């Protein structure tokens, strides 16, 4: 027995064109149906997004996904096809509600690119129970993914010590996740991505030249591999110019470097090494390039890099890094483990009291204290609208993002990149360490 008609994809239709409203969990809609039936659907509520803890050993996280959420909100609707599917398990009144659904509430939260810590009220969603509960899965799927990627990327940026990083993970994740990952990595400080969709959609600079296949394509049956490599390099330079990046480890790195300089001359832009003992090979390649007169040719390394291997290469003559699998999987922490919890009903605080999952009730805002030098010292979470009197330097973190369903915040990637960079500079001495440790600053919550 096949799927019901409403669930079948139309022939020829891309499989990524599901109505945005269906990018959710079924229980959001069954809760809505019950709330509409008993009259509680329109009660004013506040839901809060936060992480109870950072991934094991991490000292900070980076908020990402805000811009994508604000972009997704107007699209989060239920069209005729979606409603046909939902009518199989929802009553007519609920389907009618969904057919007309628009989020018309308010959202406050941390700006994209802001650092966060355990208990930080990253997002506060206000509106009727009906409209807020429908957003839960959308909010968490965006923030848990993008924040995990940005947090890992920021650690890699710190480990690189100012050397550029290129995101190259598209082939290691879902095609739509790849675009979001490229965006999140760029926010965290990566210089570019190999993903063209991220360039088109978000303006992320795209980099890329050739893979090993292009070199092997030029092999002649029974002929020397050196001749194949020379032919491939000549073809690439003729097409892209001497400033291109030539991949020199298809056969032998030493021979590859010699062939690269022979093809492009001393103006060769860069070589890339994708395998082997990268530090040793980079040193040998640098010496060889300098001997051949290619003193300005850069060395790019790639191949299963993460923040730890990047840090280990800081003393080597490496000019930039290409990072793939580790980046798009959050470098061991593929989710930020953020939650979306009801904290207020009719203006009255409510809270969950389950063991190990208790969370303070009430709508909250936050500010961050610092020393006169700019080094941050504490995250202070307080009841919304009741900030404490503080004489030390501090910065308000909770900002208006959406009003009456309409975005009101600056979601430019340039602003987010700047916020990440300044946030990393503000961490105390141990905050940038890669070794496992406690959060860089404590979070203190003033009860409602």
UniProtKB/Swiss-Prot annotation:
Keyword Ligase on entry: yes
Alphabetized GO MF terms: nicotinamide phosphoribosyltransferase activity; nicotinate phosphoribosyltransferase activity
Span list, region Disordered: 1-21, 353-372
Pfam families: NAPRTase, NAPRTase_N
Enzyme class: ligase
Modified residues (Phosphohistidine): 212
Keyword line: Ligase, Phosphoprotein, Pyridine nucleotide biosynthesis, Transferase
Effects seen without this gene: Cells lacking this gene show a reduced incorporation of nicotinamide. Double mutants lacking both pncB1 and pncB2 show an absence of incorporation of nicotinamide.
Catalytic activities: nicotinate + 5-phospho-alpha-D-ribose 1-diphosphate + ATP + H2O = nicotinate beta-D-ribonucleotide + ADP + phosphate + diphosphate
GO annotations of cellular component type: cytosol; peptidoglycan-based cell wall
One GO BP annotation of this record: NAD biosynthetic process via the salvage pathway
EC number(s) stated in the UniProt entry for this protein: 6.3.4.21
Sequence similarity: Belongs to the NAPRTase family.
Protein task: Involved in the Preiss-Handler pathway, which is a recycling route that permits the salvage of free nicotinamide (NM) and nicotinic acid (Na) involved in the NAD biosynthesis. Catalyzes the synthesis of beta-nicotinate D-ribonucleotide from nicotinate and 5-phospho-D-ribose 1-phosphate at the expense of ATP. It is not able to use nicotinamide. PncB1 contributes to basal NAD level.
NCBIfam families in UniProt: NAPRTase_put, PRK09243.1-5
Official protein name in the record: Nicotinate phosphoribosyltransferase pncB1
Species whose genome carries this gene: Mycobacterium tuberculosis (strain ATCC 25618 / H37Rv)
């Amino acid at each position: 027995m096949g799927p019901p008609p409403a669930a079948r994809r139309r022939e020829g239709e891309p499989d990524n064109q599901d109505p945005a409203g269906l990018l959710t969990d079924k229980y959001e809609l069954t809760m809505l149906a019950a709330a509409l039936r008993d009259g509680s659907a329109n009660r004013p509520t506040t839901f809060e997004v936060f992480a109870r803890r950072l991934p094991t050993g991490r000292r900070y996280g980076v908020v990402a996904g805000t811009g994508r959420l604000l972009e997704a909100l107007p699209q989060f609707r239920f069209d005729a096809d979606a409603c046909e599917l939902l009518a199989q398990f929802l009553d007519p009144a609920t389907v009618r509600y969904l057919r007309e659904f628009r989020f018309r509430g308010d959202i406050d939260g941390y700006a994209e690119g802001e650092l966060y810590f355990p208990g930080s009220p990253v997002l506060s969603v206000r509106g009727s129970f009906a409209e807020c509960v429908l957003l839960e899965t959308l909010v968490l799927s965006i923030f848990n993914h993008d924040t995990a990627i940005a947090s890992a990327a920021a650690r890699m940026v710190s480990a690189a010590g100012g050397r550029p990083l290129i995101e190259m993970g598209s082939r290691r994740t879902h095609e739509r996740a790849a675009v979001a990952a490229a965006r999140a990595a760029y926010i965290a400080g990566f210089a570019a991505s190999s993903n063209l969709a991220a360039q088109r959609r978000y303006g992320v600079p795209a980099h890329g030249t050739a893979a090993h296949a292009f070199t092997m394509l030029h092999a002649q049956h029974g002929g020397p591999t050196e001749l194949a490599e020379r032919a491939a390099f000549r073809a690439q330079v003729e097409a892209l110019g001497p400033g291109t990046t030539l991949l020199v480890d298809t056969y032998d790195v030493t021979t590859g470097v010699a062939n690269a300089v022979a093809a492009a001359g001393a103006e060769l832009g860069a070589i890339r090494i994708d395998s082997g003992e990268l530090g040793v090979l980079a040193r040998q390649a640098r010496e060889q390039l300098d001997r051949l007169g290619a003193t300005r040719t850069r060395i790019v390394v790639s191949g299963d890099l993460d923040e730890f291997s990047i840090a280990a290469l800081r003393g080597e003559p490496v000019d930039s890094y290409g990072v793939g699998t580790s980046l798009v999987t959050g470098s061991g922490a593929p989710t930020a483990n953020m939650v979306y919890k009801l904290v207020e009903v009719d203006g009255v605080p409510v809270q969950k009291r389950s063991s190990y999952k208790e969370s303070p009730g009430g709508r909250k805002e936050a500010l961050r204290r610092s020393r006169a030098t700019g080094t941050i010292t504490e995250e202070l979470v307080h009841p919304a609208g009741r900030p404490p009197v503080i004489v030390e330097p501090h910065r308000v973190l909770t900002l208006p993002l959406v009003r009456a369903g309409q975005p009101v915040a600056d979601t430019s990637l340039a602003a987010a990149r700047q916020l990440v960079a300044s946030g990393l500079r503000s961490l105390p001495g141990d905050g940038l360490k890669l070794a496992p440790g406690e959060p860089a600053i404590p979070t203190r919550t003033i009860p409602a």
